[in-house]
Amino acid sequence: MLFKTHDLKDWQVEILTKFILEAGEEPRIERVGKVLEKEEGVRMEEVSGYLILLQKNAIKSLIKLLAERKKTKTRRLLCDALSEVGKNAIDLFTPFLEDSRWFLVRNIIYILGRIGKEEALPYVQRALTHEEVRVRREGIQALGLIGGSKASGMLVKALTDEDPRIRAMSAINLGKTGRKASLLPLLEVVQSKEFPKKGSDEIRAFFEAIGMVGSNEAIPVLQQLLEKKSWFARGKADEIRIGAANAMAMIGTPEAREILDAGRASKDEALQDACLQALRRKASKEPTV
């Protein structure tokens, strides 16, 4: 409860608790739904402030309301409120993961991600095999928010998903963890024979993820890709070269900088361009004094 109940007398706390519990009963939640339907003249921040005061007895009714609402703004408000109300009640959300409405399942995964507790991981993992790709994508985002070694392990498995966007999202979320344990699977992918066949967005995501980890351990592989002569079409080879250079610039250590400076002075035009681009990009993102 968000109120400072230590400032109140016992009888006041009892009345206040009873009021909040009654506010979470289904008829009251239905009234909130009718208010939200109007939208015009409704102060959403006030509705949100009211909802986050509710207790876990309101969760099922709020989820029912969430399933019925069509407007994105309203659904987001309900999801965010449920993320607060349900912090210690994950078990009340999990039955809805079996719902036939994919959009509701996606919303439940969104909520579990924002609650951010490791105990939700087995349920988020189930979302990674859902037939609807949008549910799987939400599962990847949730893993990134929950974090930890178990979530990272699930993200590694998702690097081989059939959907390229999910593979890219998995890579980025692995990079955000900054864990060296995440680096090896990322490096394995960029060195694979299949990697040059991937789309531009996916290639860029993997190199960005490697750069996020920020470890010198990536430098030998990145240097090899940066300086490699390729039999692939020039455009694809340049994409990989630029990606490797950008990752090196993100790592930003003296060792990485030395390789980029050497590449900038190279007579190989493609190598020179990649290193120059990476250094300029790095400089543009650095704060000015």
Please state what every model-predicted region is.
Residues M1-Q12, L36-E39, E68, D201, ...:
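HEAT-repeat alpha-solenoid elements in large eukaryotic scaffold proteins
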Residues V13, R43-M44, R75, V105, ...:
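Residue-level detector of extended alpha-helical repeat arrays and alpha-solenoid scaffolds
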Residues L16, E46-V47, L78, I108, ...:
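Conserved hydrophobic register position within alpha-solenoid helical repeats
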Residues E39-E40, K70-K71, S100-W102, E131-E132, ...:
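Short inter-helical turns and helix N-cap capping residues of alpha-solenoid HEAT/ARM repeat scaffolds
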Residues L54-A58, L77, V85-A89, R106-N107, ...:
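Alpha-solenoid helical repeat scaffolds
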